[in-house]
Amino acid sequence: MNRAAFRQALRIVFPGVILGLLGYGTYAYCYILCWNLYHHMGYRAGLALLIVYCILKTLVFIYWAAVVIVGPGKVTGVSPLQIFIPGSEVVDEKAQAIVSRQINPKLPDTYICDGWGMPKWCSECQTHKPDRTHHSAIVGHCVPKMDHMCFWVGTVIGQHNYKIFLQYTTLFSTYLIYTLVTTAVFTPRMGQYRRDRGAPDSIPNGNIIALLILTGAWAAFCTSVCLQSFWGVCRNLTAMEGLGRKQGDMVLVNFRYEGKRIIQPLREEDPLPFDQGFAKNWRQVFGTNPLIWFLPFPVVPAAEDYFSNAYGQKFLERIPARWLEGDGREMAAV
């Protein structure tokens, strides 16, 4: 099995494992805990616990489905950037080579580039890759503002479903914490009930023990993913960008300065390129309507905005200052 086929298989296996564990957890919580509390012990709270559990679990499935159905998005309709002005070439007749040409002044003021200062190019999709775009072999196309591939969900997380993914992880964490806390609170009462009925010990049912272990470990993992994702929203930093910074990946930026195009590597001490402050970062992901913040609807920019990712003001002030300090080079017009 090649790597691509293996990854496609994981897209099915991991969600299948999740569904299996959720099914077992539902049996342990709803029947072993809630039903016994209500039917055998006379606790009306058992019925209330069951209703809240079912509501939370239904919401988890709705938002999970929305993440997969909406998908990460696809880069389409990106017009090729005209790097140089047509007809501006100066040709060396002897060498039969272009010695200079005029750079198009209509290029975006700032963009992530390759070593030549050109916008990133995807050989698979045969298109320019706007800032924050990555090609995903899993979905077979370029994904705008790609965050990561979540095998537990079964799809890639990108610009279109990123907000819904955050809502999903929040709901899933809430569901798991609710299950863990209520199980821990009512399990001793079941033990007391056993003792009152003459049982030699108050050891809880094995399914309850398994439920506590599974929900505890799972809640810790899911909550950490949720908090990390929201921290990324606050800083306008995707998971892939954060990983690249930790690994020291070379990232080049091309920007306009006094009529020149400057190529400069990003430095670890630089401000985050897309960080515009908490309020703007939040609205970029969740939108401006507070009602939409809680509903599973994507916030999608227009296609023509692919090359208009707003850079943070601190970053835009820092890169020309570094150029004046001698860091960077001018883009060659050949």
Swiss-Prot record:
Positions of the DHHC domain: 120-170
EC number: 2.3.1.225
UniProt membrane topology term: Multi-pass membrane protein
Entry's localization field: Membrane
Annotated transmembrane regions: 12-32, 50-70, 164-184, 207-227
GO biological process terms, semicolon-separated: protein targeting to membrane
PANTHER family to which the protein is assigned, alphabetical: PALMITOYLTRANSFERASE ZDHHC6 (PTHR22883:SF23), ZINC FINGER DHHC DOMAIN CONTAINING PROTEIN (PTHR22883)
UniProt name for this protein: Palmitoyltransferase PFA5
Top-level taxonomy: Eukaryota, Fungi, Dikarya, Ascomycota, Saccharomycotina
